[in-house]
Amino acid sequence: MRAAFDFDGRHALVTGAARGIGLAIARELHAGGARVALADLDGDAAAAAAATLGVHALGLTLDVRRVDHFEAARDRLVAAWGRIDIVVNNAGWAPLTPVAAITAAEFDDVVAVNMRSVFSSCQVFGPVLQAQGHGRMVNVTSLAGQNGGTVAAPHYAAAKAGAIMLTKYFAQLLAPHGVTVNAIAPGPTATAKGRLSPEQVSAIEARVPIGRFAEAEEMAAAVALLASDRGGFFVGATLDLNGGLYVR
């Protein structure tokens, strides 16, 4: 795999990296020369995914709802690598629960996974990157956080909107210290097709001006741009990756 950007000598953490968009991001960074930690709630799957990348990749068990897991990951990676250069907050959860059936517990869990985790990660890793005088943080949000969602449930859309605002906040806080914080907002992506009926897939494709779902690798390419040296002037940006479904 030929990488679009050079990450030689960089050290990256990607959450939700056992599969899907997260794994594609990890592959892109690794192909560019980065050492990559693939973190996931399913630690065994993260380790298996890391093994497919070969050397300079490792798997971690990380529950993004728990700040102590972020702290443990920070301590382990700093001890192993001496530094962390790139943090990609990709982990997410998008249940398709009908509004009337959403419980308070599910609502809180969705917010914890999709929004509070971004805060926890920035709170834990921000000072590390700041002390180094250089770093990149990229948050994977969603089109649902921009337009309220259609297929997505309301708690997911609200949490992703919050993640976009946290991106803006931490971008302004950390930019003076050489650390950029940005986001991508994926629209319909092929990794989600398995959760949809053929009729839903066709209906979504008909609404997307480009006429198709995105590939996970297209999301990874955008993250790589934001994480690269060439992406150093992006600060607090959210890149719209939706095939024209939402234009602003």
Question: Which functions belong to the PLM regions below?
Answer:
Residues S142:
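Residue(s) in the substrate-gating loop at a strand-loop-helix junction
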Residues F7-V36:
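Canonical Rossmann dinucleotide-binding motif of NAD(H)/NADP(H)-dependent dehydrogenases/reductases
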Residues C122, A159, T167:
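Active-site helix of classical SDR
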Residues P98-V99, T103-V111, I204:
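Substrate-binding pocket helix/loop in short-chain dehydrogenase/reductase
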